[in-house]
């Protein structure tokens, strides 16, 4: 496969790319309006240490995020290690002994196993007598009848919705489906807290979960909204009283969001958010191209190049362990950092299967930079995401295709 083949593919994909550009422009307007409204200025880049009292930039960033998400309050902190850390913080903040957590998108991502208590971790929600229940999706949509029946017969404190696919074969959850199920939930019990794991999904569409009724929304800054510029961190956005509880869980009761030094992160948080619409668009174009080229080579891909996307993840089903490994190795070879390194399947914290991962990124574990990973289990699916620029993404895709077609 050569650049001429890619040009032919890009001609076919021009309408899809145009729609991605339209969404990028809409979200760019949303971000810049939030910057203007909150008078973002150079003083916001100043750093604090120690307790972090009076961190002007940090406070402005959280107001900007609240406006972008059209919600009451946001907590945007470099003290969060990951999106999983932010999800854990939110769950422990919102749930109390005897409460029930209900997942309506089936089993959550593997890294939540120890948080929920599937493996009897002594620090899990289960160890605090928090009950967990789940309702699986049906044909890539919510099981509305089961959800309605369960909620009418059981008291639920928090409903968790994971929009992206994790290491599953289902489709990601659209904003339209999210809005429909939240309306159903609130019609039965308006006090149920709907929490959405929004990782990999920000700025893929023109609305975020908090715009369609979600009470709280959580995501990572080494994914979409950090745009490859933020070195770490995560956010929690939503209703003021709930975000306040989360800030007290992250920090300490009584101090909440008034402490937490930025340690020089403010500029990268602001610049990352500023660039995020464009970087997400580049990532989407990268995986759309990959979907088209790999489908034409006979591979089972999802979503297909012309299907709706709700996250930045593309799955490629290889049904072959060696092909999966070769593809991931090819992405690593096509990356900017550690291109001469070879990914090796290994056990990783939070996962039951061996994982192979290509992440030639400037920030460790960054998923918005070109990356590819997958568990070594049948049917041997590669999960491809990212691309800081479309051009670099294209180069990596071609390198990976070259490796599996030798």
Feature names for model-found ranges:
Residues 295-405:
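Conserved C-terminal alpha-helix-loop-beta "cap" of PLP-dependent enzymes
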Residues 2-14, 21, 31-44, 52-55, ...:
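Conserved PLP-enzyme active-site core in the AAT-like
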Residues 72-79, 337-341:
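Short, well-structured beta-strand/strand-turn elements
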Residues 24-28:
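Acidic, PIN/NYN-like endoribonuclease modules and their adjacent C-terminal/linker elements
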């Amino acid at each position: 496969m050569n650049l001429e083949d890619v040009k032919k593919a890009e001609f076919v994909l021009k309408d899809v790319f145009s729609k991605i550009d339209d969404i990028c422009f809409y979200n760019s307007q949303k971000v810049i309006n939030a910057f203007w409204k909150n008078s973002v200025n150079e003083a916001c880049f100043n750093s604090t240490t120690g307790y972090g009292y009076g961190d002007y930039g940090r406070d402005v960033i959280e107001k900007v995020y609240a406006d972008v998400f059209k919600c009451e309050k946001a907590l945007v902190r470099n003290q969060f290690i990951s999106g999983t850390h932010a999800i854990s913080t939110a769950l422990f903040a919102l749930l109390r002994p005897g409460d029930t957590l209900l997942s309506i998108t089936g089993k959550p991502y593997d890294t939540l196993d120890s948080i929920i208590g599937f493996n009897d971790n002594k620090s899990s929600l289960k160890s605090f007598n928090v009950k967990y229940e789940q309702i699986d999706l049906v044909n890539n949509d919510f099981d509305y009848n089961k959800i309605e029946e369960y909620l009418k017969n059981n008291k639920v404190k928090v409903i968790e919705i994971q929009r992206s696919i994790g290491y599953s074969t289902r489709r990601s959850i659209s904003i339209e489906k999210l809005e429909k199920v939240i309306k159903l939930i609130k019609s039965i019990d308006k006090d149920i807290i709907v929490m959405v794991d929004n990782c990999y999904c920000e700025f893929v569409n023109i609305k975020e979960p908090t715009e369609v009724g979600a009470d709280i929304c959580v995501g990572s800054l080494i994914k979409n909204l950090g745009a490859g510029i933020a070195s770490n961190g995560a956010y929690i956005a939503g209703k003021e009283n709930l975000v306040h509880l989360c800030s007290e869980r992250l920090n300490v009761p009584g101090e909440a969001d008034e402490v937490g030094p930025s340690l020089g992160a403010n500029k990268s948080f602001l610049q990352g958010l500023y660039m995020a619409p464009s970087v997400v668009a580049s990532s989407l174009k990268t995986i759309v191209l990959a979907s088209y080229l790999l489908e034409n080579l006979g591979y089972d891909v999802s979503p297909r190049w012309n299907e709706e996307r709700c996250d930045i993840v593309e799955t490629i089903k290889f049904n072959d362990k060696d092909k999966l490994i070769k593809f991931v190795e090819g992405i690593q070879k096509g990356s900017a950092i550690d291109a001469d390194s070879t990914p090796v399947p290994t056990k990783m914290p939070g996962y039951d299967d061996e994982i192979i991962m290509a992440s030639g990124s400037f920030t460790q574990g960054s998923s918005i930079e070109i990356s590819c990973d997958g568990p070594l289990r049948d049917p041997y699916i590669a999960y491809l995401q990212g691309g800081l620029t479309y051009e670099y993404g294209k180069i990596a895709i071609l390198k990976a295709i070259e490796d599996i077609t030798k």
